[in-house]
């Protein structure tokens, strides 16, 4: 019965001169995820109808909603026959919502509502009109060349098309927060690449598999993803010799940021991102965040900075990362955590401790040159 899927985009129409580039990016993303370029018409997009496409469109950012549609000629009889097809025999109430964009059509929107509604009542004698809360709302749009009709609307993700806002290198862990942060960054139009620090043999194949599984789930929302695994074992062992054990996590995370910044620049990525949340752990106090962030000269995006944990968990369940995130696995930060981590670190102290670790920068350069593996995940 259905011929096409009508795709609506919201924020994109508000972007003025950039509108064409937004629409083009959205079309490319739809092609990437469904395998088919949509047709753009009437400030809408149209994609071939299939159950597979209906399912895949729920993963495309930039779409506000979509509906399976029937096309017909601008002829009242054809419109009426198409409308009758959209009524389910079990529907008890209905409404006709007509919109006449083609002012040359002989009937007004109100007249279309009346005449098509009368025909539906005649065809289904037991059905009743309910203009407030109908079980079946038949939408009719009369355009210049044809009319399209639909009764079902699927809510979509909204946001902006992935890639329109640039790209970010996301410091990825296997916890609950990090994948949710990546999802939110994609929703604001960023293409996300992933960098994860591992420390074999302490972090085993199960840990690596968990991270790959999380990136695989997230790839449904942006298409092909790049995952980089950095072997941090030598550096972790070296930093453990710091003269102030309470600064161990701060020194490690500062090292993460130095490495990530250089690596990102090499990939022409100008922002870093993570799943940090204010005050959640010792390394996420204002003082810790400030001390750690000063190791990078790139913008650091923290989309979860003010989230409640419950909010983050709810999103994780929605996007199907939660069950993977709660699987038991050894994380580099957990393995390295001191008994009493400093909660209000001082930058001057961190810099002094780094100076004592005379081989630190050389080991970071060695990691960048030899210890990063690349995976493409779809």
Swiss-Prot record:
Protein family per UniProt: Belongs to the ThiI family.
Name assigned to this protein: Probable tRNA sulfurtransferase
RNA-binding among keywords: yes
Gene3D superfamilies the record matches: 3.30.2130.30, HUPs
Residues holding ATP: 171-172, 196-197, 253, 275, 284
Keyword terms, alphabetized: ATP-binding, Cytoplasm, Nucleotide-binding, RNA-binding, Thiamine biosynthesis, Transferase, tRNA-binding
EC number, UniProt record: 2.8.1.4
Pfam families xref list: ThiI, ThiI_fer, THUMP
InterPro entries: Rossmann-like_a/b/a_fold, ThiI_AANH, ThiI_fer, ThiI_N, THUMP_dom, THUMP_ThiI, tRNA_STrfase, tRNA_sulfurtransferase_ThiI
Domain THUMP: 51-153
Pathway: Cofactor biosynthesis; thiamine diphosphate biosynthesis
Chain ranges passing through the membrane: none
GO cellular component terms, A-Z: cytosol
PROSITE patterns in the record: THUMP
Keyword Amino-acid biosynthesis listed: no
Top-level taxon of origin: Bacteria
Biological processes, Gene Ontology terms: thiamine biosynthetic process; thiamine diphosphate biosynthetic process; thiazole biosynthetic process; tRNA 4-thiouridine biosynthesis
Cellular location(s): Cytoplasm
Protein's job: Catalyzes the ATP-dependent transfer of a sulfur to tRNA to produce 4-thiouridine in position 8 of tRNAs, which functions as a near-UV photosensor. Also catalyzes the transfer of sulfur to the sulfur carrier protein ThiS, forming ThiS-thiocarboxylate. This is a step in the synthesis of thiazole, in the thiamine biosynthesis pathway. The sulfur is donated as persulfide by IscS.
An example Gene Ontology molecular-function term: ATP binding
Catalytic activity: [ThiI sulfur-carrier protein]-S-sulfanyl-L-cysteine + a uridine in tRNA + 2 reduced [2Fe-2S]-[ferredoxin] + ATP + H(+) = [ThiI sulfur-carrier protein]-L-cysteine + a 4-thiouridine in tRNA + 2 oxidized [2Fe-2S]-[ferredoxin] + AMP + diphosphate; [ThiS sulfur-carrier protein]-C-terminal Gly-Gly-AMP + S-sulfanyl-L-cysteinyl-[cysteine desulfurase] + AH2 = [ThiS sulfur-carrier protein]-C-terminal-Gly-aminoethanethioate + L-cysteinyl-[cysteine desulfurase] + A + AMP + 2 H(+)
